[in-house]
Design a protein with these regions (language model features):
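Metal-dependent phosphohydrolase cores
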Residues: 1-80, 84-190
Length: 190
């Protein structure tokens, strides 16, 4: 069976039937979105970036620490994929991950993921000739303390090859649940 496709070659020539076909196809994308996110997360395996553990293990360890600390599933998934952009968007990995998460998570969790790169810099920027207190420019933001805590409790300490890290299979149900349906999007009617 051939997939239904719009008739137009220029969007300005599309009609209601065309956009109905496209909307149905886009809605079906959510059935596979979690699997795509997980596939990309798996691409971090064996990518050490100079650390003692690979980037996938770091991500799993960050999520494991958040889970064991009693964080809710949304927060744990944010911890899991906070560095998903490390190998595709190394110059802005935090923003990359935050953009993926934004339609599905709270404003606070989005802000944490978006800014964790700068907040994580507190632990190493000085060794690169950068200002370790760069995060202080956000001191008056409502989620400053949440992001600081995320980096301190879960992110900066998750490079331990001896830590009892949960495997990816443990987190798959949480990822699938989170990415089922966006909470907000320009494509959703209010």
């Amino acid at each position: 069976m051939t997939e239904k496709r719009a008739k137009f070659t220029k969007m300005m020539d599309g009609d209601a039937e065309d956009y109905s076909i496209i909307a149905a196809s886009n809605a079906d994308d959510y059935n596979h979105l979690a699997d795509k996110v997980l596939d990309h997360l798996r691409m971090l395996e064996n990518d050490y970036g100079g650390f003692q553990v690979d980037r996938l293990t770091h991500s799993l360890q960050t999520a494991t620490r958040a889970y064991r600390d009693g964080r809710d599933d949304e927060y744990v998934v944010c911890a899991l994929i906070h560095d998903i952009g490390d190998n595709l968007a190394p110059a802005n990995h935090a923003e990359f991950a935050a953009t993926i998460l934004q339609p599905f998570v709270s404003e606070e969790n989005y802000w944490i993921v978006k800014h964790h790169g700068i907040f994580q810099g507190y632990y190493f920027f000085e060794f690169l000739g950068l200002d370790k207190n760069m995060r202080d420019k956000y001191a008056d933001e409502p989620y400053f303390e949440s992001c600081r805590e995320f980096c301190e409790k879960y992110d900066q300490n998750s490079f331990d090859p001896n830590y009892d890290t949960l495997d990816l299979d443990f987190f798959i149900p949480m990822v699938k649940e989170l990415f089922q349906k966006p909470k907000r999007s320009i494509y959703l009617q209010s």
